Amino acid sequence: MPCWSTITATRHLGGELAIGDLRCERFRLQAEGLVEVYYTPFDHVNEATRVTLVGITPGWHQMRLAYTVARDLLRGGLPHDAILPRVSSAAGFSGPMRANLLRMLDDLGLPRCLGIGSSAELFDRWADLRHGTSAIRYAAFVSERNYTGSSPPLVTVTLFRRYVFDVLAPELDRVPRSVVIPLGRAVDAALGLLIDAGALDSRRCCLGFPHPSGANGHRMSQVAEIQETLSDKLSHWFSARTA
């Protein structure tokens, strides 16, 4: 459930939100050793989606943008039930990574499967076909730094595994007609936990899709390696649901 008391606490924060404004006790959900998780308003689930993109966890940039959008909408008098969809649309997979992601999805032929012009339209006129989420839904930090999924490995952290089973799995159950595209190896491993437990159908999952971060300089060659396999999987998934 959305922590509205947490979201509304930002109403009175002025200017550009700083780390100290959000990474504080009021917003912290859990802390175990060097691992901390902070509430981030990404609770909206688009149940009409046909494509679900799963990242690792919101980083600081996304966390700040999400709260900034929520704060501004609250100040503008928007009803609570209209705020979360707007936050997800504005802040989900934002920044330079989005351009890389769109090119990679285009290379897999996703627009053709959906009957749209380009993957960019999933963030514009065809946004209702897309849902974005994370293996760890809320912003996770390790040693006060953005958690990148590898140190420590996501599947080895008990707290993170709880998010995968208790938050992500039910979320994916709510979008049964959607293909699931994990962004990178850490999310691959998280989905693997659910597949092995019988909590997720592997036929839905485009395992092996590289992380679109600019730091992954090999992403396009990695896409080329799995292009045929994942393109076929996408075609089979969507054709079976339109027959």
Please report, for each region that a protein language model flagged, where it lies by residue.
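A polyanion-binding, active-site-adjacent surface
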Residues: M1-V179, V187-G192, A215-H218, E225-W237
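Extended hydrophobic/aromatic segments used for targeting, binding, or gating
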Residues: L193-Q222
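Low-complexity, Gly/Ser/Thr/Pro-rich intrinsically disordered linker/tail segments
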Residues: W237-A243
